[in-house]
């Protein structure tokens, strides 16, 4: 068995993973009919009654204070002081965090009674991912930064509890991580290490983060993981860019720091942008994180995740990384998309290509060329696969869970594609120019050189040497 542990940082990541793990619950009753092995993503456990077998996601979540909403660390299967699995959790007592309670929505109340109803969910009642989470989590999956507050209405970006500083910017996350380590030198030993060591054969880490201050936290945790636990293990990182905002020097600097730091600690780095317009029908609301996560899950995220859990004909995380990064030096995925087919045979294509590769940092007189594709991966779910070596077929049926929006019910099959292309080259060179023009300090020259070296890995053909309007 090649277990996969998912690390989820913040609300955007929480929505994506709540949708995914809810969907996986649908496959449990299918038993032998399911093509997916649940033990890759779920861990077996025993409830406090010493009789009931439980399955908990191999998932670690990080949130700001208030981010968990009504989601409780302890539940009917795990109570405070639970020592039912001492062979796994041997890093001290579980700490319960007290905070102002948030009332459960009607869907969660109905779930507690075993009477959930999809009509109880809408875009107003799903502002936190915990509003529609269906699964019990082990108490040690949950981690919280108490110095920062989240509220979907009054502080959607997150705010420092001592003032007006927002939870934005790579450096803000780095500073908070240093504060965490200063308070607890063994933080990673008591969080991530326990999960890694319980695995029979760790298949890798699946990481989801956005480009807020969480990027700084995630980059530091992964760097420490590389240094202390597993220097060569597979790490696949999905980085979701925030909603479009006015381009400033700060947002550009943040994009540079996020791209460099996360790509360096990842085997495969997949930056994505959620679309503001899609061909999906009017029931889809692009402003709803619940809707965006469900659409992304159906078209891209779940098919990719399912490949690593297939009993036969699948693709492990390390095999996927080797397929996409054929040289060991080009690990940035720059084309991400999916096509969904509905019951009438109509197709809707949604692209998640990062805005990094669509909007130049600095003005250029030369229009972008058609990108060269170095490698790609395509997954056909209940459809005919493409006729090439990097195409895979997925026979797992589409999920049917009450927690998903109504618009998802129309789709019966999908095709997903990830590709490594020449697109990052131009963006990385633009980043180097930005550093040259605007940055000062001792790290300026080192950062320029680093970005230039990264860009050179995405060159293709003799013409690449002359398509820049000036040197960086």
Swiss-Prot record:
The lineage of its organism: Eukaryota, Fungi, Dikarya, Ascomycota, Saccharomycotina. InterPro entries: DML1/Misato, DML1/Misato_tubulin, Misato_II_tubulin-like, Tubulin/FtsZ_GTPase_sf. The keyword RNA-binding does not apply. It is found in: Mitochondrion. Belongs to the misato family. The keyword Chloroplast does not apply. This is Protein DML1. It comes from Yarrowia lipolytica (strain CLIB 122 / E 150). One of its GO terms (cellular component) is mitochondrion.
């Amino acid at each position: 068995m090649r277990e996969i542990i998912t690390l989820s940082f913040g609300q955007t990541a929480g929505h994506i993973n709540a949708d995914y793990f809810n969907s996986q619950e649908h496959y449990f009753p299918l038993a032998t009919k399911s093509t997916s092995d649940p033990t890759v993503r779920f861990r077996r456990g025993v409830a406090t009654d010493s009789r009931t077998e439980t399955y908990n996601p191999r998932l670690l979540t990080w949130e700001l204070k208030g981010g968990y909403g009504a989601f409780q660390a302890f539940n009917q299967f795990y109570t405070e002081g639970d020592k039912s699995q001492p062979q796994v959790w041997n890093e001290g007592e579980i700490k319960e965090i007290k905070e102002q309670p948030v009332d459960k929505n009607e869907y969660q109340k109905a779930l507690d009674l075993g009477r959930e109803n999809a009509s109880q969910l809408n875009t107003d009642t799903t502002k936190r991912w915990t509003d529609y989470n269906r699964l019990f989590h082990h108490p040690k999956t949950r981690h919280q930064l108490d110095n920062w507050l989240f509220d979907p209405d009054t502080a959607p970006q997150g705010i420092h509890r001592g003032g007006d500083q927002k939870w934005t910017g790579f450096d803000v996350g780095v500073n908070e991580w240093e504060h965490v380590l200063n308070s607890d030198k063994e933080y990673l030993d008591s969080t991530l290490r326990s999960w890694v060591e319980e695995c029979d054969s760790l298949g890798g880490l699946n990481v989801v983060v956005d480009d807020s201050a969480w990027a700084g936290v995630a980059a530091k945790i992964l760097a420490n993981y590389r240094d202390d636990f597993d220097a060569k293990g597979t790490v696949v990182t999905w980085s979701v860019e925030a909603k479009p905002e006015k381009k400033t020097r700060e947002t550009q600097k943040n994009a540079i720091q996020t791209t460099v730091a996360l790509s360096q600690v990842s085997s495969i780095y997949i930056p994505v942008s959620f679309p503001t317009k899609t061909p999906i029908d009017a029931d889809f609301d692009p402003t709803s994180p619940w809707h965006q996560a469900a659409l992304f899950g159906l078209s891209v995220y779940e098919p990719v995740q399912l490949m690593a859990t297939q009993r036969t004909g699948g693709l492990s995380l390390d095999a996927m990384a080797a397929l996409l990064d054929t040289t060991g030096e080009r690990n940035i995925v720059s084309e991400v998309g999916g096509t969904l087919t509905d019951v009438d045979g109509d197709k809707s294509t949604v692209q998640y290509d990062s805005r990094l590769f669509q909007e130049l940092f600095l003005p250029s007189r030369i229009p972008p060329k058609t990108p060269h594709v170095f490698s790609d991966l395509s997954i056909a779910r209940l459809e005919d696969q493409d006729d090439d070596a990097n195409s895979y077929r997925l026979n797992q049926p589409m999920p049917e869970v009450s927690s998903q929006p109504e618009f998802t019910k129309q789709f019966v099959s999908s095709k997903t594609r990830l590709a490594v292309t020449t697109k990052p080259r131009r963006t990385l060179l633009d980043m180097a120019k930005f550093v040259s023009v605007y940055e000062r300090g001792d790290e300026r020259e080192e950062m320029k050189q680093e970005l230039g070296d990264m860009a050179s890995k995405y060159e293709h053909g003799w013409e690449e040497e002359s398509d820049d309007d000036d040197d960086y």
